[in-house]
């Protein structure tokens, strides 16, 4: 389903999350976290995740697109608890609405 097919039945939401990270980076990160990525891919309501990393500033995180706010909030509650249990501190979390009309103009390829 594309943005044009969606209608107004769902309100897409974006989650931006980043935190201090000391590596691994690049392909080493991909190898180490591929199982986690597969589990995240199965999260209910998740459309996609873009993995982010910045070795220069020692940060990693992601940009997540969810079908709706309830799905985002459900994922976020569990994610924060898991990160705390792992001793990860300094997590920055921001939630955004998606302007679907402008996203279509700029070739946003959002599908479910």
Identify the residue ranges that each predicted region occupies.
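A common structural junction motif
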Residues: 80-88
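A short, exposed loop/beta-hairpin motif centered on an aromatic-Gly-Thr core
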Residues: 61-64
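Short S/T/G/P-rich N-terminal loop/turn motif that feeds into the first structured element of a domain
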Residues: 1-59, 69-77, 90-112
């Amino acid at each position: 389903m594309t943005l044009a097919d969606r209608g107004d039945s769902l309100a897409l939401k974006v989650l931006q999350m980043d935190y201090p990270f000391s590596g691994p980076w690049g392909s080493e990160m991909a190898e180490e976290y591929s199982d986690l990525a597969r589990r995240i891919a199965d999260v209910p309501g998740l459309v996609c995740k873009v993995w982010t990393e910045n070795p220069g500033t020692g940060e990693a995180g992601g940009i997540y697109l969810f079908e709706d706010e309830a799905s985002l909030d459900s994922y976020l509650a569990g994610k924060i608890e898991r990160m705390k249990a792992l001793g990860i501190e300094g997590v920055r979390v921001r939630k955004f609405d998606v302007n679907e009309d402008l996203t279509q103009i700029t070739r946003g390829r959002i599908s479910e």
